[in-house]
Amino acid sequence: MAAAVVLAAGLRAARRAVAATGVRGGQVRGAAGVTDGNEVAKAQQATPGGAAPTIFSRILDKSLPADILYEDQQCLVFRDVAPQAPVHFLVIPKKPIPRISQAEEEDQQLLGHLLLVAKQTAKAEGLGDGYRLVINDGKLGAQSVYHLHIHVLGGRQLQWPPG
């Protein structure tokens, strides 16, 4: 119970910090300033798989800092450094699955766990009125980091169609 109180206090502080970033309409300020919307170009240049560590593997091993919202033995949840909505966080498995299209039958429980953690974190972040889950897969899906990740976006009215 004490951990839940600490988590709730941290989430309130994080929401205040996000509100102070000046998010208005389509312009979103992230840790590196205004996003450039160039994810497609990044995806075109990304290397699908390989031995090199990804930015997410560096966050997992704590060699790269991140604003971590949740962690357990199977996954990690952290804020996106270039948010596309007032609330934008990523849910990643600790198991290095490069793409959702490369997930195996044995990953079924893990994939379900990622979705449940996304739901629980969205609730903790105050997204009770709705949010969007996004998984980009491959170059044409604009995947720029080849470590499976679920984007959770909310905090404003999202538009349709998304792409």
From Swiss-Prot:
- Where on the chain is N6-acetyllysine found, per UniProt? 119, 139
Compartments where found: Mitochondrion
Chain location of the short sequence motif Histidine triad motif per the record = 147-151
InterPro entries assigned to the protein according to its UniProt record, in alphabetical order: Histidine_triad_CS (IPR019808), Histidine_triad_HIT (IPR001310), HIT-like (IPR011146), HIT-like_sf (IPR036265)
Q: Which domain of life is it from?
A: Eukaryota
EC assignment: the record states 3.9.1.-
* Pfam families per the UniProt record, alphabetical: HIT (PF01230)
Single GO cellular component term: cytoplasm
**What does the UniProt keyword field contain?**
Acetylation, Apoptosis, Hydrolase, Lipid biosynthesis, Lipid metabolism, Mitochondrion, Nucleotide-binding, Steroid biosynthesis, Transit peptide
Under Gene Ontology molecular function, one entry of this record is: nucleotide binding
The active site is formed by: 149 (tele-amp-histidine intermediate)
Query: Which positions does UniProt annotate for AMP binding?
Result: 63, 80, 136, 142-145, 149-151
What is catalyzed by this enzyme? Answer: adenosine 5'-phosphoramidate + H2O = AMP + NH4(+)
Q: In which tissues has expression of this protein been reported?
A: High expression in liver and pancreas. Expression is significantly down-regulated in hepatocellular carcinoma (HCC) patients.
Entry annotated with the keyword Hydrolase: yes
Instruction: Provide the family line.
Output: Belongs to the HINT family.
Role, per record: Exhibits adenosine 5'-monophosphoramidase activity, hydrolyzing purine nucleotide phosphoramidates with a single phosphate group such as adenosine 5'monophosphoramidate (AMP-NH2) to yield AMP and NH2. Hydrolyzes adenosine 5'-O-p-nitrophenylphosphoramidate (AMP-pNA). Hydrolyzes fluorogenic purine nucleoside tryptamine phosphoramidates in vitro. May be involved in steroid biosynthesis. May play a role in apoptosis.
The protein's name in its UniProt record: Adenosine 5'-monophosphoramidase HINT2
For this protein's source organism, the top of the classification is: Eukaryota, Metazoa, Chordata, Craniata, Vertebrata
Gene symbol of the encoding locus: HINT2
